[in-house]
Amino acid sequence: MNDQVIIFDTTLRDGEQALSASLTVKEKLQIAYALERLGVDVIEAGFPISSPGDFESVQTIAKHIKNSRVCALSRAVAKDIDAAAEALKVADQFRIHTFLATSTIHVQDKLRRSYDDVLEMAVNAVKHARNYTDDVEFSCEDAGRTPIDNLCRMVEAAIDAGASTINIPDTVGYTVPSEFGGIIQTLFNRVPNIDKAIISVHCHDDLGMSVANSIAAVQAGARQIEGTINGIGERAGNCSLEEIAMIIKTRQELLGVSTGIKHEEIHRTSKLVSQLCNMPIQSNKAVVGANAFSHSSGIHQDGMLKNKNTYEIMTPESIGLKNQALNLTSRSGRAAVKSHMDSMGYKEDEYNLDALYADFLKLADRKGQVFDYDLEALMHFSNLREEDDFYKLNYLSVQSGSVMATTSIKMQCGDAEMCEAAVGNGPVDALYQCIYRVTGYEIVLDKFDLTAKGEGEDGLGQADIIANYKGRKYHGTGVSTDIVEASGQALLHVINSIHRADTIAEMKQKKIATV
């Protein structure tokens, strides 16, 4: 049996169905290019009959994508298939994907036909699609709940009609891995012409089983997996293709199969899809979550410093990420703190590790995560406290109109108090202009997030920012019942960290000058 698993991406079709707003044609093409770079074999670009916009998207992608096969979905209806073919005809290589429900509940309650009628519809659809291309995929919708005898009949008939790929969807995410793998195995055992088609699976995540079910299907003989980037899709989503790719790569000795995925493109593709679809990635999501390669436990960090394989079964670099530093939290040990000091170039005789670690724990208990610039400040200034910040916001007033906003502030700058006012595109922008003028710092914001803490009118808002200043990243957080004030606190958190770093740099320079 062929050991190459075909990766079929349906982010632009099934994945887009989960979005509150449709992607533009330009955005879909961006994602299609990313999928092509990733090495996806088949890109399902849309459902042409559903709308003029979808037709245009499929046609545009079909025209521009050269290294992946472009596919379009159609119901088992001649006009749908005709529309798919019309949209796809500009492609170098294309596939028509037609589908029909096969489960008892769908046949009786949705289609309201006999199973023999449904069988005939499927055969006619496949034959009609074959008039346009030899690459025809037929899907048995809700196959996971279809009586096995009926499913075997449908698969055999569709292959006889000319389908080159047979897709077995667990449409409502109902099955468990042993059960779904058993369905695939039964098809291989009982369908006489099964060797004339590739068996594909399309699993949904309603019970959190989509990836496991897909892997079970591969072990039973399936050689195409359908899914989406980041697992986006209707209801609980689809099978996550980045997880599939890394499972097959990481456990290749067990599974005995491979894919054509360029794994180093995974992170880049995942981030693009998240941004364009406005769907944040869960921090603890496998493979691409922000915490996927983070280690905060002291025991884990000690193991990682001795041998990364103790707690990492795959590397950040394998998905296109730079090597991730150990997160410093109150659970981190001395070894992790020393490792960070070493990475910044400090020698052991330049600081007292025990004293630094004691101060580090106090700071970590207050702020959660500690960064390299915090450690450096602790080394020079010992016990850091918020009341020691050079810049503080004493007063804030905001006036917002329909177009622009005006903000007035009073700030403590060491021993002096300064006033400033500014107009901006919204109250936060105006506040930031004030702070930049007072402090003299103007930084580049890489990330700005606002989240609610609690409910109701007295709930807190939290602002989190990541800023770039002279090539170094700084993190800031602010919490207040007023989101504008919280945003200001977050920026001042960053600017005070930068001010301390600049002070340390000056101290180092003076030390060098006196040597």
Curated annotation (Swiss-Prot):
One of its GO terms (cellular component) is cytosol. GO terms for molecular function: 2-isopropylmalate synthase activity; acetyl-CoA C-acetyltransferase activity; manganese ion binding. Its cofactor is Mn(2+). Mn(2+) binds at D14, H202, H204, N238. It is found in: Cytoplasm. Residues 5-267 form the Pyruvate carboxyltransferase domain. PROSITE patterns: AIPM_HOMOCIT_SYNTH_1 (PS00815), AIPM_HOMOCIT_SYNTH_2 (PS00816), PYR_CT (PS50991). The keyword Amino-acid biosynthesis applies. InterPro entries: 2-IPM_HCS-like, 2-isopropylmalate_synth_dimer, AIPM/Hcit_synth_CS, Aldolase_TIM, LeuA/HCS_post-cat, LeuA_allosteric_dom_sf, LeuA_bact_synth, PYR_CT. One of its GO terms (biological process) is L-leucine biosynthetic process. Catalyzes the condensation of the acetyl group of acetyl-CoA with 3-methyl-2-oxobutanoate (2-ketoisovalerate) to form 3-carboxy-3-hydroxy-4-methylpentanoate (2-isopropylmalate). Belongs to the alpha-IPM synthase/homocitrate synthase family. LeuA type 1 subfamily. Homodimer. NCBIfam families: leuA_bact (TIGR00973), PRK00915.1-1 (NF002084), PRK00915.1-3 (NF002086). This is 2-isopropylmalate synthase.
